[in-house]
């Protein structure tokens, strides 16, 4: 009885070892076989080959190594499954990025669109400086010319009046920034034209002509009048004889003799 049991156990062990040897045999594709299979999949559009196609493909691949029909079938099935999984991962990652961008858009200080960055990266001016508008007479705006990123900055400022106001007050932005390329010849740059400057210059020229005309008329009118001196030459004796003395009864006032004072009054009254 025991002998029969041992025989049965020996038969079971032999069957298990056979199954293990059979399952351990795996297909190890060569580089040439993988190259041909990928060429069929990507370039020839073979996704789900038929049984006849599998037989012909396996017969072709046996020239480069050991292979069976089931190996060809499973290779196509696994390749399609990996491709579908890759597409799902890409779609999930794209959806996650879109959700992150949408959530960041709800918080303005964390994210800005490229248009907003371009909008807020322009040159700004100091709100504490108040300059009159270019249309006001006799006032020129501030013109600043600079090039960014090249290490040089040239500024030209021309103004007559620029008042300083406390921060937060109203101001007029009269600053103009003009980018300059240092690699271009500066002599070939055409000068900028300012229409309001030409208007101010014309008005200033008209005012200058009016002032010159008034001065000429004034000089012409003065030449027709006779110049009279305050103290005529023939009255020098009166001035020389004029003396000042202190009188005790005058209350501290200085006065001259009566004759000299009368002569001085006649001289002064002779002028219109």
UniProtKB/Swiss-Prot annotation:
- Where in the body, by tissue, does this protein show up? Expressed in the central zone of the active shoot meristem.
For whether the record's keyword set contains DNA-binding, the answer is yes
Keyword Transcription belongs to the record: yes
Give the disulfide map.
none
List the biased-composition ranges (Basic and acidic residues): 1-11
**GO CC aspect terms:** nucleus
Q: Name one Pfam family in it.
A: Homeodomain
Q: Which GO terms describe its biological process?
A: cell differentiation; flower development; plant organ development
- Which intervals carry biased composition (Polar residues)? 12-24
Where is it located? Nucleus
CDD domains named in the record: homeodomain
Disordered as annotated region, ranges? 1-24
Q: Which UniProt keywords apply?
A: Developmental protein, Differentiation, DNA-binding, Flowering, Homeobox, Nucleus, Transcription, Transcription regulation
A single Gene Ontology MF term assigned here is: DNA-binding transcription factor activity
Tell me the PANTHER family matching this sequence: WUSCHEL-RELATED HOMEOBOX 1, WUSCHEL-RELATED HOMEOBOX 1-RELATED
Q: What does this protein do?
A: Transcription factor that plays a central role during developmental processes such as early embryogenesis and flowering, probably by regulating expression of specific genes. Required to specify stem cell identity in meristems, such as shoot apical meristem (SAM). May induce shoot stem cells activity in order to maintain the stem cell identity.
Tell me the protein's name: Protein WUSCHEL
What organism, scientifically named, is this protein from? Solanum lycopersicum
Q: Which gene encodes it?
A: WUS
């Amino acid at each position: 009885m025991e002998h029969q049991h041992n025989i049965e156990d020996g038969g079971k062990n032999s069957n298990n070892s056979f199954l293990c040897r059979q399952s351990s045999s795996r297909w190890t594709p060569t580089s040439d076989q993988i190259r041909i299979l990928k060429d069929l999949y990507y370039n020839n559009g073979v996704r789900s080959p038929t049984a006849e196609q599998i037989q012909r493909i396996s017969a072709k691949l046996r020239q480069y190594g050991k292979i069976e029909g089931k190996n060809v079938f499973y290779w196509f099935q696994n390749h399609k499954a990996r491709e579908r999984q890759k597409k799902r991962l890409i779609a999930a990652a794209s959806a996650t990025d879109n959700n992150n961008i949408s959530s960041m858009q709800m918080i303005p200080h964390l994210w800005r669109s490229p248009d907003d960055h371009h909008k807020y990266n322009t040159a700004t001016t100091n709100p504490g400086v108040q300059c009159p508008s270019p249309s006001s007479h006799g006032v020129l705006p501030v013109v600043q010319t600079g090039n960014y990123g090249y290490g040089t900055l040239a500024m030209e400022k021309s103004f007559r009046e620029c008042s300083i106001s406390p921060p937060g007050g109203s101001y007029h932005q009269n600053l103009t920034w003009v980018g300059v390329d240092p690699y271009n010849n500066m002599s070939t740059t055409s000068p900028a034209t300012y229409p309001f400057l030409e208007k101010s210059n014309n008005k200033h020229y008209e005012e200058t002509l009016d002032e010159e005309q008034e001065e000429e008329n004034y000089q012409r009118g003065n030449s027709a009048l006779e110049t009279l001196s305050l103290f005529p030459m023939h009255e020098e004796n009166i001035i020389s004889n004029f003396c000042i003395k202190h009188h005790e009864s005058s209350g501290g006032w200085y006065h001259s003799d009566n004759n000299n004072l009368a002569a001085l009054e006649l001289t002064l009254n002779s002028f219109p």
